[in-house]
UniProtKB/Swiss-Prot annotation:
The modification Allysine is found at residues 122, 126, 290, 309, 360, 363, 434, 438, 441, 485, 488, 554, 558, 615, 619, 623, 677, 680, 730, 734, 793, 796. The gene is Eln. One of its GO terms (molecular function) is extracellular matrix constituent conferring elasticity. It comes from Rattus norvegicus. The modification 4-hydroxyproline is found at residues 39, 75, 105, 207, 220, 223, 244, 338, 402, 408, 518, 539, 637, 646, 662, 670, 715, 842. This is Elastin. Major structural protein of tissues such as aorta and nuchal ligament, which must expand rapidly and recover completely. Molecular determinant of the late arterial morphogenesis, stabilizing arterial structure by regulating proliferation and organization of vascular smooth muscle. The polymeric elastin chains are cross-linked together into an extensible 3D network. Forms a ternary complex with BGN and MFAP2. Interacts with MFAP2 via divalent cations (calcium > magnesium > manganese) in a dose-dependent and saturating manner. Interacts with FBLN5 and FBN1. Forms a ternary complex with FBN1 and FBLN2 or FBLN5. Interacts with MFAP4 in a Ca (2+)-dependent manner; this interaction promotes ELN self-assembly. Interacts with EFEMP2 with moderate affinity. Elastin is formed through the cross-linking of its soluble precursor tropoelastin. Cross-linking is initiated through the action of lysyl oxidase on exposed lysines to form allysine. Subsequent spontaneous condensation reactions with other allysine or unmodified lysine residues result in various bi-, tri-, and tetrafunctional cross-links. The most abundant cross-links in mature elastin fibers are lysinonorleucine, allysine aldol, desmosine, and isodesmosine. Induction: Down-regulated by DTR via activation of EGFR. It is found in: Secreted, Extracellular space, Extracellular matrix. It comes from the Eukaryota.
């Protein structure tokens, strides 16, 4: 005992030094320091004498194994108290070192701790020593001492206790673990509110904002509402705000730590809180779709909805359009659509229809300036269908379709004066706007015509206002509708630029000027009815009634519907050498032609015949090997200078300067529909470009326009009377149905050397009996030749060679049959109408291009060799 008691002061000295450093708040807990220490220490050393958590429970063994509430203490917080000699064990900064339980990690500021507890905690942690158990009396089992040194209780020179388990306290940089779930799966915060948040208080230890410290959040010293925005409505409004059951809205929300801006509140509606969606509860529209965008700022959900709704019902903006007093509208009022400003405006009764049509046109992308047009000259002024469709340079009108230089029309000044249909803008606004809109719907370009290229003389539809005859009485509504329908399918225009096609300008094409071609001037061609009224319209100004003109306009539109190619022979110089030199030529009545290579059979029979002979001849012609029609020279729509498709030449009505077969010339209503139907089945896009519908050799070689016996070459022809005209028109239409080679080709060579040379339109070709009276004008007395009905029936089977081919096999009765696929060529002489086979189809081999160069068989291989397809 003496030795033991003698060793006590030395550890006491160390404890005194330690206590001076740690400044304990209250007595007790340190063995031998104050009453309640280790038995044998100072008086009062009853185990557990001081009633603080962690005090020894007797036998010098600390009872600090369990923390308050029976919870296991944290590491270094009394776990080793049972091994020490003093109550409280070794806890961290050391119960048993004179500190209360409150000095343990996790126990700071719990009642029972002193003001210096935190400092002691900090100092002990910084020292990195657990200040092992005091109990190591020399010779005893000193549980712990300073690491690497003799036990604290060991007397120098004595047997030191077992080296203390150093470092059991909170070492430098150690992290005090927290209670609760901590960080959950995936690194997400735990479900327990507050767990995982930094701070001295482990998350979840203090309920709510601190049961003992109202207003204190999870973060120590951070009351809700002071610098950290409150998370519940009304939060931060007092010391008890946010406490469960105390705050105005029921306290803390699940998963929302108070006082720390991590998650937004979960209550419906935020009442202005900065982390809400800005909407009030109960479905009331919010004050903005985003935080910070209230109503009236133009931003947010309301602004977006309003803008979308405005765009849905409002037209394009801009001054004077919808509404306003904008400039230039439809049809030229002060406003835009139409009238003064607004949609309804003060326009005509058809304003609504015009606006609707314009909108429909604009819907499909009409080019700018079309619908609506410029200031009052588009729909229905001088544009569509004013001066354009119909009107000057439009469809129909001067320079349009029909008109000067159009289809039909006269290349030069017509025989009837300007033919503007009723004056510009005469068509009702509703019909005009609707037609224009429909035309524009498929992409017609804007301007005076379709397309609009100015105001010139003759040429492409809409190119000019050159003098000429118009539709000749066709109703404006029908003309507008037909024009719109034609434009709907993109008619490329049936004529080339004014002057390019020979015959467009008077004098350019021999025969364009009246008198140059026999038959152009009334009386020059035998049998022609002098003074055919009307200039080459479709059907012309000489029709008996406007109804026929309307039908012609409709037919022309239908013809344009399927793409009557632009330009009837777009190669200048169409009629070159041999353009009917010498007029009718010798033997015009007898049918005996002159000139080498004309294809005339000497002794070709002309003159009058009998109906039976004509019928048999036509039947024989139809069954001929190459199915060449008798008299195809001047009977095919639009193939000659004189009798052609309406609107190709400078002639009266149609193709040339002369009166044509029904449907070809001026005023011949029957046949205009046939011409349209002929064009319907595939007139090539470039009707006579090089290699087009008769590039070189387009209208036949020598003897080109029908060769000998053109329209009267079959002997025994009967003079056609007026009743035969209707049959001729019908038959011609039927003939055209099966592909009479398109609408002629006025390309290079088309009317070139030999194209209309001596014999081509010479004696028999267009001579007496060829296009003489009786086969041309209904009611006229014929001079012979094949009756129109018979010739048309022969033509029904689709002769492709539009002219005689030298050396071809004739069919009985005279006349030279055309052989499909033979081109007029400097390489291979004797070309015919190569390029297009029977039925108007390109030949399979070489596509007709080489046929123009004279390669035989170009149109007579395979299916195109005259066999009727099933």
């Amino acid at each position: 005992m003496a030795g033991l008691t003698a060793a006590v002061p030395q550890p006491g000295v160390l404890l005194i030094l330690l206590l001076n450093l740690l400044h304990p708040a209250q007595p007790g807990g340190v063995p031998g320091a104050v009453p309640g220490g280790v038995p044998g220490g100072l008086p009062g050393g009853v185990p557990g004498g001081v009633y603080y958590p962690g005090a020894g429970i007797g036998g010098g063994l600390g009872g600090g194994a369990l923390g308050p509430g029976g919870k296991p203490p944290k590491p270094g917080a009394g776990l080793l108290g049972a091994f020490g000699a003093g109550p409280g064990g070794l806890g961290g900064a050391g119960p048993g070192a004179g500190l209360s339980y409150a000095s343990r990690p996790g126990g700071v500021l719990v009642p029972g701790g002193g003001a210096g507890a935190a400092a002691a905690y900090k100092a002990a942690a910084k020292a990195g020593a657990g200040l092992g158990g005091i109990g190591g009396v020399p010779g005893g089992v000193g549980v712990g001492g300073v690491p690497g040194a003799v036990g604290v209780g060991g007397v120098p020179g004595a047997v030191g206790g077992i080296g203390g388990i150093g470092g059991l306290g909170v070492s430098t940089g150690a992290v005090v673990p927290q209670l609760g779930a901590g960080v959950g799966a995936g690194g997400k915060p735990g479900k327990v509110p507050g767990v995982g948040l930094p701070g001295v208080y482990p998350g979840g230890v203090l309920p709510g904002t601190g049961a003992r410290f109202p207003g204190v959040g999870v973060l120590p010293g951070v009351p809700t509402g002071t610098g950290v925005k409150a998370k519940v409505p009304g939060g931060g409004g007092g010391a008890f705000s946010g406490i469960p059951g105390v705050g105005p809205f029921g306290g803390q929300q699940p998963g929302v730590p108070l006082g720390y801006p991590i998650k937004a509140p979960k209550l419906p509606g935020g009442y202005g809180l900065p982390y809400t969606n800005g909407k009030l509860p109960y479905g009331v529209a919010g004050a903005g779709g985003k935080a910070g965008y209230p109503t009236g700022t133009g931003v947010g959900s309301q602004a977006a909805v309003a803008a979308a709704k405005a765009a849905k019902y409002a037209g394009a903006g801009g001054g004077g359009v919808l509404p306003g007093v904008g400039g230039g509208g439809i049809p030229g009022g002060a406003g835009a659509i139409p009238g003064i400003g607004g949609i309804t405006g003060a326009g005509t009764p058809a304003a609504a229809a015009a606006a609707k049509a314009a909108a429909k046109a604009a819907k499909y992308g009409a080019a700018g300036g079309l619908v609506p047009g410029g200031p009052g000259v588009r729909v229905p002024g001088a544009g569509i269908p004013g001066v354009g469709i119909p009107g000057v340079g439009g469809i129909p009108g001067v320079g349009g379709i029909p008109g000067v230089g159009g289809i039909p029309g006269v290349g030069g000044p017509g025989i009837g004066g300007p033919g503007i249909v009723g004056g510009p803008g005469a068509v009702s606004p509703a019909a005009a706007a609707k037609a224009a809109a429909k035309a524009a719907k498929y992409g017609a370009r804007g301007g005076v015509g379709i397309p609009t290229y100015g105001v010139g003389a003759g040429g492409f539809p809409g190119y000019g206002v050159g003098a000429g005859a118009g539709l000749g009485g066709a109703s404006q509504a029908a003309a507008a509708a037909a024009a719109a329908k034609a434009a709907k399918y993109g008619a490329g225009g049936a004529g080339t630029l004014g002057g390019l096609v020979p015959g467009a300008v008077p004098g350019a094409l021999p025969g364009a000027v009246p008198g140059a071609l026999p038959g152009a001037v009334p009386g020059a061609l035998p049998g022609a009815v002098p003074g055919v009224p009307g200039t080459g319209g479709v059907p012309g100004a000489g029709t008996p009634a406007a109804a026929a003109a309307a039908a012609a306009a409709k037919a022309a539109a239908k013809a344009g519907q399927y793409g009557l190619g632009p330009g009837v022979g777009g190669v200048p110089g169409g009629v070159g050498v041999g353009g009917l030199p010498g007029g009718v030529g010798p033997g015009g009545v007898t049918g005996i032609g002159t000139g080498p290579g004309t294809g005339l059979v000497p002794g070709d029979l002309g003159g009058a015949g009998t109906p039976a002979a004509a019928k048999s001849a036509a039947k024989a012609a139809a069954k001929a090997q190459y199915r060449a029609a008798a008299g195809l020279g001047a009977g095919v729509p639009g193939l000659g200078v004189g009798a052609g498709v309406p609107g190709f030449g400078a002639g009266a009505g149609g193709f040339g300067a002369g009166a044509g077969v029904p449907g070809f010339g001026a005023g011949a209503v029957p046949g205009s529909l046939a011409a349209s139907k002929a064009a319907k089945y595939g007139a090539a896009g470039g009707l006579g470009g090089p290699g087009g519908l008769g590039g070189p050799g387009g209208l036949g070689g020598p003897g080109g326009f029908g060769g000998p016996g053109g329209l009267g070459g079959v002997p025994g022809g009967v003079a056609g009377g007026a009743p035969a005209a209707a049959a001729a028109a019908k038959a011609a239409a039927k003939a055209a149905q099966y592909g009479l080679g398109g609408a002629g080709g006025l390309g290079a060579g088309g009317l070139g050397a030999g194209g209309l040379g001596a014999g081509g339109l010479g004696a028999g070709g267009l001579g007496a009996g060829g296009l003489g009276a009786g086969g041309v004008i209904p009611g006229a007395v014929g001079l012979g030749g094949v009756s129109p009905a018979a010739a048309a029936k022969a033509a029904k089977y689709g002769a492709a060679g539009l002219g005689g081919v030298l050396g071809a096999r004739p069919f009985p009765g005279g006349g030279v049959a055309a052989r499909p696929g033979f081109g007029l060529s400097p390489i291979y002489p004797g070309g015919g109408a190569g390029g297009l086979g029977v039925g108007g189809k390109p030949p399979k081999p070489y596509g007709g291009a080489l046929g123009a160069l004279g390669y035989q068989g170009g149109g007579c291989f395979g299916k195109s060799c005259g066999r009727k397809r099933k």
